[in-house]
Amino acid sequence: KTTGYASVDFETNAKPLYNNDFKPTILSVTFQPGSGISIPLQHFDPSVEYLQKNNKWLRWLRYFGKEVIENPNIVKIAWNWKFDNQNFKKYNIHHRGTVIDGMLAKYLLNEERPNGLKDMVKKYLPEFAGYEKYDKFDSIPWDKKPLEDLCRYGCMDTDFTLRLALFLEEKLINKGFYN
């Protein structure tokens, strides 16, 4: 609530959203550049097994949703908001207030591909290029990624999304898209 921004990103087991075996594994959040936190949800790691009892993970998610996503005073930021918003809606969390989608901001400025987060990190934050390849993270299937590595990756995603979205938003304002 202090910064007024929340960059969010779900990681899942890569199953289709409306299949019975779909699981959101973590939700990562960045409130300020250079930081991040991950909320474990339905990850298989034994250290968070207690979250599955009585759907404690869902209570955590809904609490976050109420305090952040449904708070109209916090600007929500994502790279491909459609994906994250579908996850929130699945669990009856409905955003209020401003949303900045970094992918759409990039597209408005230049519709030519690539439009992906990793490509934009490589272009605008080159010191972090290839972060998804750290410890061969990208070679592990989504439903088997270790919790600690997944959280590190998710926090980098939300951190870089926040940095890039704010950078791209300034460009949109300077080009007269809005004020």
Each language-model region and where it sits:
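N-terminal accessory regions of nucleic-acid-interacting proteins
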Residues: 1-10, 14, 20, 24
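Active-site-proximal helix-loop-helix substrate-binding element of RNase H-like nuclease domains
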Residues: 16, 25, 32-174
